[in-house]
């Protein structure tokens, strides 16, 4: 979500902002007991609620958010654009920025794995521009166009997260102590509500997506929680020079499902408003899961991805990966009543699901459910028609949803090219963004690069950085499945702070070209510079049998600052899959305002 990319701390010093209204918010963060899926554990509350409040602003508002940390551990609230030291227990910090760009965004923690503990919420920046050209692609009717604009400015919010009965510290300790990639979860939550389902091992085995078992030895089965064993060679990779301790994985983490009934989210929609149109902003506040979403007997138009408008396309279901945001528009044209919203995990990590209900206004007391399912419990489309009209991030014809209004990168060569080799190194839980370097999450916490940009020069830590020049075009070439022990690779959800990128290339094999231009000439069908997608989170291809893949991301440096590039799977980021891009470092100011400093030591 480079949701406030153009209002970074550095950019704020370089550009003059126009006057706008000032909006002030306060977020008080506490650590309390809760049971969002019916099972008790400690978690993070924001202003006494989980997840945090939806924050709604108008484009170009001057926003001031005071974050008060009433926990006993340090924390950050991350707007994908601010660089600061963690907020210590008992301290506070005031974030100041322009509400830009318009669209569907979110906020969350970037301190260790505390996203796992519940620090997240939705952000909506209402636009001031005219979007008739967007809605007219859905309907030519003037009433519909006006109604969709109103619906988009007053959407329903669906914050979808995965959930474990273990805190982030406990979960990471289990992975480290066992030496295995533990990724089994308990629930998927919608707006902080959900249950734990235990339909039985045989049922879950039958819900595996077609082709998944082909990647495993014959006879491989999932557990009664729908998880593959982390000790499988296809899961842990390697061989690694280390000792595995599966006996240190506690009961009920991978096996031993314990069901609990609680409460699922109910979304009340009104077909009498906005000519029957409703908009929904969906935030994938997940830590591991790659979820799908469908609404029984309803179709929807996907019109925004990662806070950027796209030329709308109509789907029965859509898959959204950790860290992404989608906005959809739906016509409430079915029989009034109660419909199931299905939110299954679709990745190979686990077979589990969640449900919510969409209820037409006036039918809240009607318990009868209407409609036909679009997805199975395991996320498999229920018919060829559903499959052929669903959004899949690994299919280029759907994944490359072109921006609206049109936005294209410079053709030909970029000014700078950087080859990044992603994967595991040394153990199942060590992940790198650039061949060997592991990014520690506490890197430069006490002396942030924003204040000390030259601190790593001449040291090995310079390998954790890229430096770019302002007003330059940059290509990031990402190679997967080539590191020893990581030939069979899990997908990664790669997110760049500070600005979006166009994915101009996506192909198989080992990248062995001297330049992107040479690759374009050799493999023109693997590149798209005319209508490429434009977003801040991209999915790398998984490798079930050792096939190699690469992607090329292009962007223009117009937002100077120290920006994190990382995998949005929390276990991968915690294991080192991150680096800092020092964009436009030649344009950074010599002096920073005192209010950007947190603590007296900076």
Curated annotation (Swiss-Prot):
GO terms (molecular function) for this protein are: copper ion binding; oxidoreductase activity
Q: Which residues bind Cu cation 2?
A: 80, 108, 568
Give each disulfide bond as a residue pair: none
Pathway annotation from the record: Pigment biosynthesis
Instruction: Give residues annotated as binding Cu cation 4.
Output: 492, 495, 567, 572
Plastocyanin-like domain span:
30-128, 157-345, 461-584
Q: How is the cofactor bound?
A: Binds 4 Cu cations per monomer.
Q: Say which domain of life the source belongs to.
A: Eukaryota
Cellular component terms, GO, for this chain's entry? cell surface
Where does this one sit in the cell?
Cell surface
- Pfam families per the UniProt record, alphabetical: Cu-oxidase (PF00394), Cu-oxidase_2 (PF07731), Cu-oxidase_3 (PF07732)
Q: Which cofactor does this sequence's record say it needs?
A: Cu cation
Name the Enzyme Commission number(s) assigned to this protein. 1.10.3.-
Q: Which residues are glycosylated?
A: 176, 241, 264, 388, 430, 454, 470, 512
- The entry's Cu cation 3-binding residues are 110, 497, 566
Q: Which residues form the signal peptide?
A: 1-20
Q: Which UniProt keywords apply?
A: Copper, Glycoprotein, Metal-binding, Oxidoreductase, Repeat, Signal
Binding of Cu cation 1, residues = 78, 495
The similarity annotation says: Belongs to the multicopper oxidase family.
PANTHER family to which the protein is assigned, alphabetical? LACCASE-RELATED (PTHR11709:SF488), MULTI-COPPER OXIDASE (PTHR11709)
Question: Tell me, what does this protein do in biology?
Answer: Laccase; part of the Pks1 gene cluster that mediates the biosynthesis of an anthraquinone derivative pigment that contributes to conidial pigmentation that provides protection from UV radiation, heat and cold stress. The polyketide synthase Pks1 produces 1-acetyl-2,4,6,8-tetrahydroxy-9,10-anthraquinone though condensation of acetyl-CoA with malonyl-CoA. The dehydratase EthD and the laccase Mlac1 further convert the anthraquinone derivative into the final conidial pigment.
List the protein's name: Laccase 1
What species does this protein belong to? Answer: Metarhizium album (strain ARSEF 1941)
């Amino acid at each position: 979500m480079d949701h406030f990319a153009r209002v970074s701390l550095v950019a704020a010093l370089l550009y003059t902002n126009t006057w706008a209204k000032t909006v002030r918010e306060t977020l008080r963060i506490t650590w309390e007991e809760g049971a969002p899926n019916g099972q008790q554990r400690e978690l993070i509350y924001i202003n006494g609620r989980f997840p945090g409040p939806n924050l709604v602003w108008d484009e170009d508002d001057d926003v001031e958010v005071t974050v008060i940390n009433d926990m006993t551990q340090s924390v950050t609230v991350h707007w994908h654009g601010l660089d600061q030291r963690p907020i210590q227990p008992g301290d506070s910090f005031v974030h100041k920025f322009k509400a830009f760009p318009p669209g569907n965004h979110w906020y969350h923690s970037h301190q260790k794995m505390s996203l796992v503990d519940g620090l997240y919420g939705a952000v909506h920046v209402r636009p001031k521009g005219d979007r008739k050209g967007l809605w007219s692609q859905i309907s030519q009717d003037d009433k519909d166009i006006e109604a969709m604009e109103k619906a988009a400015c007053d959407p329903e919010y669906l914050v979808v997260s995965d959930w474990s009965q273990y805190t982030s510290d406990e979960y990471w300790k289990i992975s480290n102590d066992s030496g295995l990639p533990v990724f089994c979860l308990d629930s998927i939550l919608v707006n902080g509500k959900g249950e734990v389902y235990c339909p039985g091992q045989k049922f879950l085995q039958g819900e595996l997506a077609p082709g998944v078992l082909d990647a495993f030895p014959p006879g491989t089965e999932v557990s009664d929680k729908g998880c593959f064993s982390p000790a499988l060679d296809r899961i842990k990779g390697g061989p690694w020079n280390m000792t595995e301790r599966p006996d240190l994985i506690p009961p009920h983490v991978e096996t031993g499902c314990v069901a609990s009934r609680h409460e699922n989210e109910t979304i009340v929609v009104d077909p009498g408003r906005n000519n029957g149109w409703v908009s929904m902003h969906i935030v994938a506040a997940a830590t591991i899961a790659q979820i799908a979403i469908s609404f029984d007997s309803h179709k929807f138009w996907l019109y925004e991805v990662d806070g950027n408008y796209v030329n709308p396309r109509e789907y029965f279901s859509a898959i959204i990966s950790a860290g992404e945001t989608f906005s959809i528009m739906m016509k409430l044209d079915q029989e009034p009543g109660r419909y199931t919203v299905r939110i299954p995990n679709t990745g190979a990590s686990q077979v589990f699901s969640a449900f919510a209900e969409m209820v037409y206004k006036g039918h809240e007391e009607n318990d009868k459910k209407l409609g036909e399912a679009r997805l199975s419990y395991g996320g498999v489309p229920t018919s060829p028609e559903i499959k052929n009209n669903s959004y899949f991030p690994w299919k280029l014809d759907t994944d490359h949803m072109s921006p609206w209004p049109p936005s294209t990168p410079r053709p030909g060569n970029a000014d700078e090219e950087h080859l990044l080799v992603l994967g595991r190194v040394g153990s199942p839980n060590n992940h790198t963004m650039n061949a060997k370097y592991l990014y520690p999450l506490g890197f430069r916490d006490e002396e942030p690069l924003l204040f000390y940009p030259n601190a790593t020069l001449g040291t090995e830590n310079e390998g954790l950085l890229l430096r770019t020049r302002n007003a330059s075009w940059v290509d990031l070439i990402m190679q997967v499945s080539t590191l020893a022990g990581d030939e069979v690779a899990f997908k990664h959800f790669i997110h760049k702070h500070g600005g979006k990128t166009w994915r101009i290339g996506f192909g198989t094999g080992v990248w062995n070209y001297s330049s992107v231009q040479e690759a374009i000439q050799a493999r023109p069908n693997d590149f798209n510079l005319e209508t490429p997608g434009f977003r801040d989170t991209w999915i790398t291809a998984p490798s079930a049998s050792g096939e190699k893949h690469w992607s090329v991301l292009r962007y223009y440096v117009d937002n100077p600052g120290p920006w994190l590039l990382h995998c949005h799977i929390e276990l991968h980021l915690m294991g080192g899959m991150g680096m800092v891009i020092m964009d436009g470092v030649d344009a950074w100011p010599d002096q920073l305002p005192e209010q950007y400093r947190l603590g007296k030591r900076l």
